[in-house]
């Protein structure tokens, strides 16, 4: 994958997250901000989830209260380089814990 393809795929990831939050009708207020390639989710309790792109490595990084994760694209899925878990699974687990209610980013 070249740099422009990586950015296109990361942009698609950001847009999906933002669209799911725009459509979400849960009780918690979750703010989504994108600034310079970094996506920040801010929760009512003051906690944050930060997702950023690491262009030199063609990785997406996820920082949550539970820890940090690095994802490589394998086929159509972003997969954690340590645990083998999917990006969406880890993001949903962290967001659910930090929001205090179930959050899904998959349509």
UniProtKB/Swiss-Prot annotation:
PROSITE patterns noted in UniProt: FRATAXIN_1, FRATAXIN_2
What is the superkingdom listed in this entry's lineage? Bacteria
One of the GO biological process terms: iron-sulfur cluster assembly
* Gene3D superfamilies recorded: Frataxin/CyaY
The protein's UniProt keywords, in alphabetical order, are: Iron, Metal-binding
A GO CC term attached to the entry: cytosol
Q: Which SUPFAM superfamilies match?
A: Frataxin/Nqo15-like (SSF55387)
State the InterPro entries in the record. Answer: CyaY (IPR047584), Frataxin/CyaY (IPR002908), Frataxin/CyaY_sf (IPR036524), Frataxin_CS (IPR020895)
Which CDD domains does the entry link to?
Frataxin
Keyword presence, Cytoplasm: no
The yes or no answer to whether the keyword Metal-binding is present is yes
Spell out the PANTHER family in the cross-references.
FRATAXIN, FRATAXIN, MITOCHONDRIAL
The similarity annotation says:
Belongs to the frataxin family.
Task: Indicate what this protein is called per its UniProt record.
Answer: Iron-sulfur cluster assembly protein CyaY
From what organism does this protein derive? Enterobacter sp. (strain 638)
**What lineage does UniProt assign to this protein's organism?**
Bacteria, Pseudomonadati, Pseudomonadota, Gammaproteobacteria, Enterobacterales
Q: Which gene encodes it?
A: cyaY
């Amino acid at each position: 994958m070249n740099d422009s393809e990586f950015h296109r795929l990361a942009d698609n990831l950001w847009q999906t997250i933002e669209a799911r939050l725009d459509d979400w009708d849960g009780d918690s207020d979750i703010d989504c901000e994108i600034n310079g390639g970094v996506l920040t989710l801010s929760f009512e309790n003051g906690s944050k989830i930060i997702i950023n792109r690491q262009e030199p490595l063609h990785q997406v990084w996820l920082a949550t209260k539970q820890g940090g994760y690095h994802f490589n694209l394998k086929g159509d899925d972003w997969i954690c380089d340590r645990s083998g878990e999917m990006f969406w699974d880890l993001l949903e687990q962290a967001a659910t814990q930090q929001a205090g209610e179930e959050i899904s980013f998959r349509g």
